[in-house]
Amino acid sequence: MALAKRNDIRNVAIIAHVDHGKTTLVDELLKQSGVFRANQEVAERVMDSNDIERERGITILAKNTAVTYGDVKINIIDTPGHADFGGEVERVLKMVDGVILVVDAFEGAMPQTRFVLTKALALDLPVICCVNKVDRPEARPHEVVDEVLELLLELDASEEQLDCPFIFASAKAGYASLDPDVKGTDMKPLFETILSHVPAPEGDSEAPLQVLISTIDYNEYVGRIGIGKVTSGTIRVNGEVMLVNHHDESKKQRVKVTKLYEFDGLNKVEVESATIGAIVAISGIADIHIGDTLCDVNNPEAIPFQKISEPTLAMNFIVNDSPFAGTEGKFVTSRHLRERLYRELNTDVSLRVEDTNTTEAFKVSGRGELHLSVLIENMRREGFEFAVSKPEVLYKEDEKGGTLEPVEQAIIDVPDEFSGAVISKLSERKGELRNMTTNASGTTRLEFIIPSRGLIGYRGEFLTDTKGNGVINTIFEGYVPYKGEISYRGQGSLIAYETGVSVTYGLFNAQERGTLFISPGEKVYSGMIIGQNGKAEDVEVNVCKTKHLSNTRSSGSDDALKLSPPRVLSLEQAIDFIETDELLEITPKTLRIRKKILDPLARKRASRKN
């Protein structure tokens, strides 16, 4: 077997904690390599193509692009920084020969930095560390270098990985430098470091073909598109190849490659053939899935598929049966819901979907609340109407039959005066304080290990307790023996007593009991939750009640009644809020929280039984 290097290619992934600037860095590499015309209007974070990615400023799906520097084509993959989308990170790292780790010059190494770095080190990939945002006034690049080296040591990096080059950059200002004290002029130091530090792909172009499919794209004209790296051999348009299923290698089928693409800038460019080291997109194969291998017809040997981290959290997705069901959504039936959820499995390897004992509900398991909430938001925008239950963690059993539960590392930055309240709340939720440091600017960093179920519903409380000044980052740590019962929400719900339209007078009386979620003029139904009670129990309130009229007293003006602005819940806040006997109703226009049992008498009977 004659192994050869493709010195004209480098394959590199950019990995980072959420919001440390990697997508902006890719934008700058695209601009400075001449992908865009000089006068072309370019959107910020051009790699984040999905609406939710642009709105939230996070990357959810791994993206492929390529730039040419000198005579070398650099294939760049921008990966998600959040552990909930770790399935994406783990897969795409199989396509590359090195990684650029982007770390914020102020925040330093964070929980997700550890997560993505662990995955890269496990595959023995060389690392280039890019300390980004060095132009921030509070930047501390020298300390951040030490933090990254400590993290590499902690994660048992090899000697080669420990000897990683450091680049100091401001992606926003468009420069990089090899010295933290010297401001650069362009991105040349980073380009040069990629060429010198990331090895050229190696393989035998005459050997039997092997292409591992790492991502699936979809185009309504050509259907499913498989994306992967040519590990050995050569793939050709109109050539016959063997598709080997990663679940069952005995499942093999002969297929034809109708179109073949390589990446150039943000575009896919049609090519006739591709050989070792090339990252290609292949269309014309209807049954292609993530993890499958395209092989030589006469020598169909599959590449082992990277085992993806298991889900830790589950929710039920349920057909909406509220009194307002079907009035705002386009896709509302059980068939619609089932088809959409199972379709998601084609592109999301971290997701699990199971049928339940009723055709109206499906159990959906994912890597965390963000993972599932992004799916919910996508479905909502597509016109789906459905309900979801409170998230629940997925337990495991040890060898002796004991219960194991998932725990997370939480790193929290709060102003000093709020640290006591945070420690108290997390301790109640079975959190263990592992480390506490205070810096000169009056901020305390707390490091906790806490059960995943202890974090469900906590983020809303955290924002209240820290007056919106706290930052919490979490990362899955592993499974430990069950830590015992946790007492949850200390406040009950305000429940609408009757179906109708809310009025100022009814809301004015209800707001004395707690915090409202709705304004006057909103349609409500009996059993719908319209606010949070100040006390622990649930209370029924009549928000449709108008002022009683009499001969001696006119109704007066409702304008004289002053209502506090309602608390409008985001999707994540609403998911955090619901209890086990409640559901979140989701339509393209509205989020409504409701009791599972809408009838008040039936609800009382059920609570007595429990």
Name these PLM-found stretches.
Residues M1-N610:
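Structural and coupling elements of P-loop NTPases
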